[in-house]
Amino acid sequence: MQWIKIFTSIFGNPKIQLLLKERDGDTIFRIWIQLLTIAGTSMQGGKIMVSTNKPLTVEDLAKITQKTNKKIKNILDKLIHCEMILFENNTYIIKNWEKYQSADKYEKMLEQNRERQRRYRENQKNENNVDVTLR
């Protein structure tokens, strides 16, 4: 996925308001946005992955953000407490990813684009294989 949805009312969200009032609230918010973009890149239903089979770890996120492991762990715990992310099977997951990101619509759009491209190529092939007869 090359984009993620962020609603214009994000700063009116009580969870975001509470997080922004925390010490280092700006950092927490930035990391939240980074988690959304990483989940969007991995395209695994909101799972926050480094690669197809490797979930993002506290250590990975600390390296990416240049923060300490302790700070990242505290931030992730706050996001879990606010029910913004889940931690299941050693994987951080954006809660309600499908609902907010319309991933199903994105997949449908990709499928429509593939079908449109297939038809275009078929038409190009048919046009290039036309027999010309001379009189």
Label the predicted regions.
Residues 105-135:
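Charged low-complexity intrinsically disordered patches
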Residues 1-93, 101-107:
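Positively charged, structured surface patches that bind polyanionic biopolymers
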